[in-house]
Regions:
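Flexible loop/hinge segments that line or gate small-molecule binding clefts
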Residues: 32, 37-75, 186-194, 199, ...
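Hydrophobic alpha-helical
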Residues: 11-15, 19, 23-44, 112, ...
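Hydrophobic alpha-helical segments within soluble ligand-binding/sensing domains
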Residues: 10, 67-93, 107, 137-139, ...
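Hinge/cleft segment of the Venus flytrap/periplasmic-binding protein
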Residues: 96, 100, 104, 115-119, ...
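Short secondary-structure boundary segments
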Residues: 29-30, 54, 97, 159, ...
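Short beta-strand segments enriched in small/hydrophobic residues
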Residues: 24, 29, 66-67, 92-101
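Short, solvent-exposed amphipathic alpha-helices that sit
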Residues: 76-80, 103-123, 137, 141, ...
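Short beta-strand elements in bilobed, periplasmic/extracellular small-molecule ligand-binding domains
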Residues: 1-3, 94-95, 116-135
Length: 264
């Protein structure tokens, strides 16, 4: 049931599932607080419930849920900087960042900072500019940075839409040879790898998230088995334009299931 990112609709959907007497429920909340409310509704009805897209352990009382599966954005940021460092141990990186204030960019920044500290100073982020997840704004901030004379030889873009904007700006300035590293592994991102727009993508396949969430629910409801871990982080799988064989598409559930079987 699609709650359309609405708390009210999600409560209505949960009430409908409870009235139908389903054996188990998987919840994709829009916040941990909303997730906790829905979990507690399932608890009151005696229906097992599992969570995806958020780690719930930060709440004092999240309710009783089977497990949660979610992306850890700091690990993606860390992986991006380390991948760049492997290509160029003295890289000068422009971080085209997402929007401040919602917590997502901030987690990426934690990972970037952690990687830079671990690498010891030879790799540098020479500029961090916020393009707020938008292609046009990424074009503008990249163009402004080029015009400022700041030297950089790698771009870490916080998503594929911004990576496209960065590339457009580089191309207009005759600098399209500067590699761009992005995140997410979306279908658009995969095409950008194939087209040479991105040098690499730090993928975190949502198909793995969906399959792992289903496995958690099925194993509990059908087999009575609890998962070994209460929280599972999505793996960060670096995919380069030179070798896309490790890419797992967002809708390739067979590949996701195979990956989980091989990486227990």
């Amino acid at each position: 049931l699609d709650s359309k990112n609405s708390l009210e609709d999600s409560v209505t959907a949960m009430e409908s599932l409870i009235q139908q007497g389903v054996d188990g429920i998987s919840v994709f909340p829009i916040s941990t607080e909303q997730g906790s409310q829905l979990v507690k509704m399932a608890n009151e009805a005696g229906i097992p419930v599992t969570i995806e897209n958020f780690a719930m352990d930060g709440l004092d009382d999240p309710g009783d849920y089977i497990a949660s599966v979610a992306c850890e954005y700091d690990k993606i940021g860390e992986a991006a900087i380390k991948w760049i460092a492997e290509q160029d141990p003295e890289a000068k990186i422009f971080f085209c960042a997402g929007q401040e204030g919602a917590g997502v960019y901030e987690k990426y920044q934690e990972g970037v900072d952690r990687a830079l500290e671990e690498l010891g100073g030879d790799v540098k982020v020479v500029a961090t500019l916020h393009a707020d997840w938008l292609t046009d704004k990424a074009y503008n901030v990249t163009t402004d940075l080029i015009n400022s004379g700041t030297e950089f030889n790698y771009i870490f873009a916080n998503n594929d839409m911004m990576a496209q904007g960065c590339y457009n700006a580089l191309k207009d300035a005759g600098k399209e040879n500067i590699p761009i590293v992005s995140t997410g592994g979306s279908p658009d991102g995969f095409k950008m790898l194939q087209d040479g727009i991105e040098a690499a993508n730090m993928t975190a396949p949502v198909s793995i998230q969906g399959v792992k969430t289903f496995m958690n629910l099925y194993n509990k409801v059908a087999l009575g088995e609890d998962p070994a871990e209460k929280f599972t982080a999505l793996p960060v799988i670096p995919v380069s334009a030179d070798d896309t064989s490790s890419y797992i598409a967002w809708d390739d559930y067979a590949a996701a299931y195979k990956y989980l079987g091989e990486n227990k």
